[in-house]
Amino acid sequence: LAHALCAAAGRPPGRRTADYPAAERARQFIHASLGQPITLDQLAQAAGNDRWRLSRDFRALFGTSPYRYVMLRRLDLARRLIAAGQPLADAAAGAGFTDQSHLTHRHVQTYGMTPDRWRRMLHS
């Protein structure tokens, strides 16, 4: 049925291609806004697509969901701030986490250790 509908519309059957420029606009928005709350609606607006298409395209192009990408970038930023000597609470706030507990939970979930343990490993 899908092939017949595509043929009737004058389009070849198959999947549409991912919109790289839109996904890249969302990615750039993420990088510019890490210290602030970021919603999928904001990303969709920055990309110029609806949230469902953006989510599909983002995953297809970058291999992860927009939410996971934001979380990994925040963890990267928090680690840089911690390595630069910032207290954990300040690093959490600077990287856009709601509090130090949120940073710790996500850090353990992703890396298997607390940020404090990771910091001590850096200095040992």
Model-derived features with residue positions:
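Short coil/turn helix-boundary motifs
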Residues: 33, 37, 85-86, 122
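A short secondary-structure junction motif
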Residues: 4-8, 61, 85
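Basic/polar phosphate-binding segments, predominantly the helix-turn-helix DNA-binding elements
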Residues: 31, 37-73, 92-118
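An amphipathic alpha-helical interaction segment
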Residues: 1-31, 41-49, 53
